[in-house]
Amino acid sequence: MLSRSIGKAAGGLVLGLSVAAAAHAAPLFEPVTVLSRAAAGSEPALGKLLATPSTATVQEVRVDAAATAQPQLEFELLGQRVQAVRSKVESLPDGGSIWYGQFRSPSDRLTAATSNGQDDPGNSVILVRSGNTVTGSIRKDGKLYRLRPLGNRHVLVEVDESRMPADHPADYNQLPKIPMGNNDRIGIAQASSGTPATIRVLVVATNAAVAAYGGNMQSLVQLAVAESNQGYVNSNVGITLQLAGYETTSYTESGNFTTDLTRFRNTSDGYMDSIHTSRNNTAADVGVLLINNTSYCGLASGIGSTASTAFAAVYWDCATGYYSFAHEIGHLQSARHDIASDPSTSPYAYGHGYRYEPASGSRWRTIMAYDCSAGCPRLNYWSNPNISYNGVPMGIASSADNQRVLVNTKATIAAFR
């Protein structure tokens, strides 16, 4: 009885403080107009965005980048007025910043739906500020929106994840299984993340990808790294991903994922050879090539990797929000898809992603899982039976524990450079 009274009193205090804080939420952006293909005119990047199958709606918005210095933000998601509160902020070496936050619940209080105390991934905001531009991923009730600069304006994009490209080309089924250091934890799944590890990634974007995106590609890369790190925190992985370097390449894409990835990985074939010098100079453990191939989301060099094979290619439009950037690095650490889509037990029988598909109610999947048969959002979590989402374990100890895989292999990949 005493604890209930304290809880009610504390709840009333929190609610009162939240309502007061809400009055001071800074406007992040205001709607201007919904854009149509007729509005694209001579703007190729806008035309491409509007023609992308996964684009549900594009709205021009007026952004106040300075608002990201504030702890509470307010904005409109296609007619729905929402407020978000900051959970943390990070400074970037280039003077920019990353704003992490959560939406307020209808009662004006924050919700945390996971058993590990992390914020709800279905109601989250990550924003990268660079000068007067803001690039971000926004999830509201599981729905994905993207905020991004496009030419001399900003747009809010509503994404239909059911129409995203397939995760991989058929070549995925022939990927080599590369043994990594034998650091497997004894026994069944454990909650510990072990010794922390830092993995450094060099990101190279083709000029075609930069042109097709039409925004601040470096900010998109920083967003991909930030999302990856949030996923590691959410799932108790104990990895920090660092952006070792970002550069562009004039390499002309072949139109084939495997060909482009092979040329990116090879050190002396006359294609992108200089990136290996950059990799050594920046001490990057992993290399990721961002390309403009709309056929698929990505491809890694193997299930597992060595220092000479730790390379992946990612379609830029899948890199953030859909988490393909982290997904492909996950493959390089030996993580596999959900077991229904990817039944191989090599190198780890438990190393699969996880899909939750109840007969009724909310469906979801983790980072490495393919889409549900009836569609479901991809949450920024790795499968982990020790963590629950809305009371449901996010994995199975014997077959779906990507967290355990990443913990097993992180020291090996972090020592590649």
Curated annotation (Swiss-Prot):
The active site is at 328. It comes from Stenotrophomonas maltophilia (strain R551-3). Keywords: Hydrolase, Metal-binding, Metalloprotease, Protease, Signal, Zinc. It catalyses: Cleavage of Xaa-|-Asp, Xaa-|-Glu and Xaa-|-cysteic acid bonds. Residues 1-25 form the signal peptide. Metalloprotease, specifically cleaves on the N-terminal side of aspartyl, glutamyl and cysteic acid residues. GO terms for biological process: proteolysis. Belongs to the peptidase M72 family. It comes from the Bacteria. This is Peptidyl-Asp metalloendopeptidase. Its cofactor is Zn(2+). Binds 1 zinc ion per subunit. GO terms for molecular function: metal ion binding; metallopeptidase activity. The keyword Hydrolase applies. SUPFAM superfamilies: Metalloproteases ('zincins'), catalytic domain. Its EC number is 3.4.24.33. Zn(2+) binds at residues 327, 331, 337.
